[in-house]
Amino acid sequence: MPAWIFVNRSLALGKIRCFGFDMDYTLAAYKSPAYEALTFELLLERLVCIGYPHEILRYTYDPTFPTRRLVFDELYGNLLKVDAHGNVLLGAYGFTFLSEAEIWSFYPSKFIQRDDLQCFYILNMLFNLPETYLYACLVDFFSGCSRYTNCDTGYQHGNLFMSFRSLFQDVTDAMNNIHQSGCLKKTLEDLEKYVKKDPRLPILLGKMKEVGKVFLATNSSYNYTNAIMTYLFSISEAEASGRPWRSYFDLIVVDTQKPHFFAEGLVLRQVNTDSGKLHVGTYTGPHQHCAVYSGGSSDMVCELLGVRGMDILYIGDHIFGDILKSKKRQGWRTCLVVPELSWELDIWAQEKERLEELKRLDTHLADIYQHMDGSSCELQVINFTKREIQMPHESVVEQEQANLDPASCLLSCNQRSLPAKSCLSSAI
């Protein structure tokens, strides 16, 4: 599948004086699902270490289930697919899809305030995929374990109550713990297994440097960045010894803490590239070629490189941390890396006939509504057309609910349905 570039507005690359890059999932692409499986295994081990049941270790990472940009409901433990306006499109409790009635009972008008950070957490990044799957696994485990009583907002075990909010906090703490130690260490121990290497990368950056300035701004530490970038640019022994990776950049900034980097930022400190340690005090001298800095801000990048916001094209994978903040606060031109698009474009090509049929049915339904007079015949046609449009999992859920007492759709403290694993990413 060739790489595609989509544009929201025209961009004259000849006017770009400076190219900026994030590292993780931009210059450094991690191999999927091997990298996510590693993270997932380390998360399970960490949770067991802090007291979670050993039985959760039976779960293995399934790359077909999670997708990016799902929302975790910290109150009810549901994973939600939400559109840009806050409308709930799909929901899952563990591996069980929520019915229409269940979604309405949890979220009146099928709507949520996505910026309500007290209740909802948006799993924005590719780094969040193992975490997303873990939430489903934990809900699946505790819901099906006879030792725990299912409640609306968590699980009761004797005199102990574990809320979904505390479960969320435990997973978040585990993520922070493994990324500071275990995951980074395991990745560096076997770079070939977890990191993709593209021989075209040095060529690309070399050409960019011929026509402008190039900088790297990453949240990763220097030692990790140095190991990853050395691997990516060591295409051959001759090239590795002839040109170090730092020579491809005019400016290198690590530990940026984006999106904070695009606001007031942090103290700019220089990194000792031999030891990886930071020099004491704020760096106030002129920019030194191939030097590495820690912290700083986007304003300092512009000052050190002598460029303005509109002169910069910044390329990253995080729509919030990399793209929106740099665009809105600094006026940088931006390019979002979305690796999932390759997969989705493949599906688009494979399912072209089905998509055309859906478009035809949608147009047909609109025509019926436009000219309907309320006759029973037209209502039958409308219902038939709607059933044709429904996705398979929606039809199954609808049929299951038709066979149940309506009152059973309202989930009480002890009546949450047991999970039956589904594929959330493909359904979405």
Swiss-Prot record:
The keyword Hydrolase applies. Mg(2+) binds at D22, D24, D317. The active site is at D22 (nucleophile), D24 (proton donor). It comes from the Eukaryota. Keywords: Hydrolase, Magnesium, Metal-binding. GO terms for molecular function: 5'-nucleotidase activity; metal ion binding. SUPFAM superfamilies: HAD-like. NCBIfam families: HAD-IG-Ncltidse. Belongs to the 5'(3')-deoxyribonucleotidase family. This is 5'-nucleotidase domain-containing protein 4. It comes from Homo sapiens (Human). The gene is NT5DC4.
